[in-house]
From Swiss-Prot:
High-level lineage: Bacteria, Pseudomonadati, Pseudomonadota, Gammaproteobacteria, Enterobacterales
GO terms (BP aspect): DNA replication; DNA synthesis involved in DNA repair; double-strand break repair; SOS response
Gene name in the database record: recF
Keyword check for Magnesium: no
Pfam families reported in the protein's UniProt record: SMC_N
Protein's UniProt keywords contain Transferase: no
Residues annotated for ATP binding in this entry: 30-37
GO-annotated molecular function: ATP binding; single-stranded DNA binding
InterPro entries: DNA-binding_RecF, DNA-binding_RecF_CS, P-loop_NTPase, RecF/RecN/SMC_N, RecF_2
Cellular component GO terms, alphabetical: cytoplasm
Protein's name in the database: DNA replication and repair protein RecF
Family from the record: Belongs to the RecF family.
SUPFAM superfamilies: P-loop containing nucleoside triphosphate hydrolases
Length: 357
């Protein structure tokens, strides 16, 4: 499915924009601060309900306006789908799909699977475990129908359990929460483990093409001891959890560790190599989704040229083309993407929030 049309109103520095898009490559060219990243962010927000540069809705609404409006048309193999998102300064959202209101953000995310590659995306590799959990959870969300509901319930129960830890004196008082929490935690951990195994070969093959000089390994850690029932862990950790006032073990502490030649990648790879690895992982994840479900990702790439030399840019471009997916690329100069452009591409110039093609 590709985004054939995008309407933006009062988002960041963009007052109004109506863009007819290519199902292939779409290039956004402009100086720093011109608004090219804002276009990528509008697409991301349309599919996620939040921006990738700010979690506060008021910061992405254009100055002195009350709300932003985003609208898109998605073209699938058999039908077109109309989607829309409005969000005000208080953070209240309205999702519209095919002209009807009352839909959930998760429905947009399902309709628009996308991979985001930004200069800040190194956090996948050198940031905390939450970024790598999010990587696995993206895959589980798009591959397991029940994942989002289970994940939402897990978050709710953990919040309630942590609040209860401040009030209880005996473990038996926590059992009502743990009775619900334990099967959810085990199911989510099983899904994550199965996904990490299923995608391992895709990641290894893509990383070998991008970084043949390294031997990369991937390992999923579920957030509590191996071969130990989660129920036993919770009961045994009660006194410590009560002192900490939070649950110290569980799927919310899981990690997906990546090593190069036996050492953490953040200690071994250069910034250019880390960017290649990040791109390889995102590509592998998108290609796995296509093979398993027949659905294609949208790829959003901010500041395409940064950290990469000509040869590496060429390698990334050729792999992106091979996906036959829709790709949005922001660059400062068109010279950086001239070799990627073809008769099906579209080139947009962005200047002070105004977009022309």
């Amino acid at each position: 499915m590709s985004l054939t049309r995008l309407l933006i109103k009062d988002f960041r520095n963009i007052e109004n924009a109506d863009l007819a898009l290519s199902p292939g490559f779409n290039f956004l060219v402009g100086a720093n601060g011109s608004g090219k990243t804002s276009v990528l962010e509008a697409i991301y927000t349309l599919g996620h309900g939040r921006a990738f540069r700010s979690l506060q809705p008021g910061r992405v609404i254009r100055h002195e306006q009350e709300a932003f409006v985003l609208h898109g048309r998605l073209q699938g193999e058999e039908r077109e789908t109309s989607i829309g998102l409005t969000k005000d300064k208080q953070g209240d959202s309205k999702v519209r799909i095919d002209g009807t209101d009352g839909h959930k953000i998760a429905e947009l995310a399902h309709l628009m699977p996308m991979q985001l590659i930004t200069p800040e995306g190194f956090t996948l590799l050198n940031g905390g475990p939450k970024y790598r959990r999010a990587f696995l959870d993206w895959g589980c969300f798009h591959n397991e129908a029940g994942f989002f509901t289970a994940w939402s319930n897990l978050k709710r129960l953990l919040k309630q359990r942590n609040a209860a830890l401040r009030q209880v004196s005996r473990y038996e008082q926590l059992r009502p929460w743990d009775k619900e929490l334990i099967p959810l935690a085990e199911q989510i951990s099983t899904w994550r483990a199965e996904y990490s195994i299923a995608i391992a070969q895709d990641m290894a093959d893509t990383c070998q093409q991008f970084l043949p000089e390294f031997s990369l390994t991937f390992s999923f850690q579920r957030g509590w001891e191996k071969e130990t029932d989660y129920a036993d862990v919770l009961e045994r950790s009660f006194e410590r959890d009560r002192m900490l006032t939070y649950t110290a073990h569980g799927p919310h502490k899981a990690d997906f560790r990546i090593r190069a030649d036996g050492a953490p990648v953040e200690d071994t790879l250069s910034r250019g190599q880390l960017k290649l690895l990040m791109c390889a992982l995102r590509l592998a994840q998108g290609e796995f989704l296509t093979r398993e479900s027949g659905r294609r990702c949208l790829y959003l790439i901010d500041d395409f040229a940064s950290e990469l030399d000509d040869a590496r840019r060429g390698l990334l471009a050729s792999r992106l083309k091979a996906t036959q997916s829709q790709v949005f690329v922001s660059v400062i100069s068109a010279e950086h993407v001239i070799d990627m452009s073809d008769e099906n591409s579209k080139m947009f110039t962005v200047e002070k929030g105004k977009i022309t093609d």
